Amino acid sequence: MFQVSLFLTLTVLTILALMTTLVLGVRVLIAGGVSKTNIRLVVSLKKAAFFCLALTFLNLGVVYVSQITASTPPINAENSIAELVKLDLNGRKQWISLRGHDKNKPVLLFLAGGPGGTQMAAVRHELSELEKHFVVVNWDQPGSGKSYYAEKTGNITAQTYIEDGHALTEYLKERFSQEKIYLIGESWGSALGIFLVSRYPESYHAMIGTGQMIDFAETERLDYAMALEIASKNGDDALIKKLRANGVPPYYGKDVTWKSAVYLNYLSRYMANHPGIQNPGYNTFRDVGSQEYGLLDKINYFRGIINTFNHVYQQLYTIDLRKDYAKLDVPVYFFMGRYDINAPTVLVEEYGRILDAPEKGIVWFEHSGHSPWINERDKFVREVISCFLED
């Protein structure tokens, strides 16, 4: 957080210096420009301009240093691995973290939610126990976090993630000399995981979906209706008015993020205050302040959630796993929070009934909402080990 504090301090000083420079510049112009009687004012203007320029370059230097010194904390074990790696995946520069107590353990790729979300630091904080049993890989997908500039936002599609996810899988298989890897997908990442195991079943042992997305358009309609229902019970008239003004989703255009946020944030707050949910909410400030992210990455942490989500999410409304992915050749398990009202569990149960897979199952987390991996992390780790390593 020292870098953040320094950056903010320098930014404030730069703004003050710029304002001083502008004020002095206006005074010089009013006084008739450079003249012998105005020389002291001109000298002050030059000093202010130089100071402003120096602060700007100093701040840029702080940003640059923060980017090149970003790292993931070491793991103190003889055969451990703890690295941030920049990869070229289909011509797009992207970042992953690799963490494990033994680099010979099975590889587990965690697919973050979003699109546009990064959980590189969050997974390290919440699921460090998994690092004793796997080489845990976190991938900042195109348009998120450290990989925000991997592709122009306007060019990103679901196919982009599928292609790059496959390329990343091939890299991991080759680097760690493993024929297959394991997948965990969270929220949007759970749908991406289904896409990957469907298209490339030979590359994956098994997959776990948590906060599983099934039908994106129906999910938005159900979430909207749930928010209206809760708001009506609570007498939240202002929210009801805003929801009705926005209309029933799905939304399209430039305001998808902001319109969706009205009911999604409301549902998140509801789950965060639910007495049946353990360890509720998200530790966003802890995560964005983590050392994996440089200052520019920290800014892009939020840009991905806003810009990438807005562009990509509206492309997903035609996807319904029940129709398009009813048969898979890889074992699939669903880790569901009993109180998840973000990804409606009724859709997951329906998909689970019709899904044809070598093995399938639903694991309920009785004290969780949309994020069992945060709400009940100890049980989450135990169930991952049970599904992946003990069968």
Indicate residue ranges for each PLM-predicted region.
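The serine-hydrolase catalytic nucleophile loop
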Residues: 115-127
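Glycine-rich "HGGG/HGxG" loop immediately N-terminal to the catalytic nucleophile
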Residues: 120-121, 143-156
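Conserved alpha/beta-hydrolase
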Residues: 131-148
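Alpha/beta-hydrolase
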Residues: 237-323, 330
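Catalytic histidine-centered segment of alpha/beta-hydrolase-like enzymes
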Residues: 368-377, 381
